[in-house]
Amino acid sequence: ADMYAGTRAETVLGKALKGVRRESYELLTKAYWPTGPGKNDRGLSRKHIMESCNASLKRLKTDYVDLYQAHRFDVETPLEETLGAFDDLIRSGKVLYIGFSEWNAKQIAAALKIQDEKGYYRFISSQPQYSMLWRVIESEVVPLCSNEGISQIVWSPIAQGVLTGKYLPGQKAPAGSRATDKKGGADMISSFMKEPILNAVQKLIPIANKVDLTLAQLAIAWVLQNPNLSSAIIGATKPAQIKENIKAAGVKLDKSIMDEIDLVIGGLVERDPAKNASPNPRA
């Protein structure tokens, strides 16, 4: 996204991809959160979308992005304005496809209605939080998107790191972990840092061992069992973490394992469709 690391994430990625054949990879980014101090340096107004996209292309050193996403829903901008701007970006060739992140079913349905009425290009992807512990999309967002041909690209399949098992009940969080980093996600992980959840997570480790997986691999594999998902986003601070996590790709979990997981954590799972992992300060 444009705002990660104060826009530096896109700059670093652009440099890393220099010399790599553009057709060999897919590039995704997002817009919404503040990228500067100005009133128009945020949100989904036509002005910010156009300026943000142009700035992202410059930082990424490319002529287009494959998927451009609304990082959140903007309650202060008319939806027609936002969708019109996205449509113009596609028609200009700067964007190939559009999507959204953390929108609820009502917002998605409203957008699709406008896109169909106006003849705009439709959304093709949803990027919500989803994990064993966070299933708020299952009751409303997934059925709607499935019916409308919108796939899920989920984030935080290991619940901000809680589903690695490194956070132990009754003990302080490891130094340097997300739970101790107030600028790097301590608030977001707080909903999972409860004793009943941490105790249950430890009980998942023997289940992972049964299928020769680490707990993180089991968590990612669990997410990928959902047929409505196209992919899962994994984060890492070390190369070894990436090597471990990608081993979950292609793993098939049988029903007995899936049932065993639900037996351990079923009562602790968040399913409320009204919940959002990152509260919208503009809502």
Annotate each predicted stretch with a short phrase.
Residues 1, 13, 27, 56, ...:
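Conserved, mostly hydrophobic/aromatic
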Residues 1-2, 29-31, 72, 100-102, ...:
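A cross-domain feature marking catalytic cores of carbohydrate-active enzymes
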Residues 1-24, 63, 91:
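N-terminal binding-site loop/beta-alpha segment at the start of enzyme catalytic domains
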Residues 10, 14, 53-57, 83-87, ...:
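Generic structural signal for well-ordered alpha-helices
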Residues 31, 104, 130-134, 156-163, ...:
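Glycine-rich beta-alpha junction loops
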Residues 36-140:
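Glycine/proline-rich, positively charged
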Residues 137-178, 214:
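Aromatic-lined glycan-binding groove of carbohydrate-active enzymes
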Residues 147, 171-211, 225-230, 237-283:
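Terminal-tail/helix-coil boundary detector
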